[in-house]
């Protein structure tokens, strides 16, 4: 009797995870490493990745930290070259680096708007562009752009963020159409409510947290390991016929039946 197919096995694969010094980036990197991938992990300061590098190495995988400022084109080009040189190839990109400004729309400044759009949308495009240039000659690649549940509807208080994540969803579809002929799939993973540095102030408000739980159909916010299966699937050979899609991992909140405002009560 033959052995079962080792689904979602990333052994021998090299994954680049941007913004991996903390938060969701570490969740994604950890899941990929546990599935066998070696990692290139980025942050604006390489030293910020030191502890996570040690963690990945403790799992028996290799990890290389690379500095990356997604708002700087020269930094993106340099990072892509260093990422490829680290292991000789790039199989997977998890395009995760992002930021948010939490203010009423009437109070958002020009610079704050630009910060969010340049990081979340322009940065996502040019990181994907430069990594795709490394993937195209090999005719293989898995690109996972990290979006948000805000790509399907808006929330008060984070208008630029919603605009940027909606843009990532559409960008994903366009890149999937353009690069599919080169064996590259491009998908968007859109988490719902997960505790991160960006929304810590909300999660520290117990009244708001109970309000949120009541409006998520599964009655709880996301936990780190709730994202593992989704990111590993989209990074693996098993997703070879899935491209241009947005996978919402949100406990059902995007059904629209109940909605939680980002405003504290």
PLM region spans:
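Short C-terminal tail/terminal secondary-structure segment
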Residues: 2-7, 153, 232, 243-265
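Conserved glycine-rich cofactor-binding loop
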Residues: 14, 21-22, 45
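Substrate-binding pocket helix/loop in short-chain dehydrogenase/reductase
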Residues: 104-105, 109-117, 143, 212
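Active-site loop immediately N-terminal to the catalytic Tyr-X3-Lys motif
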Residues: 106, 153-159, 181-182, 219, ...
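Active-site helix of classical SDR
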Residues: 128, 164
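Alpha-helical segment proximal to the catalytic Tyr-Lys
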Residues: 133, 177-181, 240
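Residue(s) in the substrate-gating loop at a strand-loop-helix junction
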Residues: 148
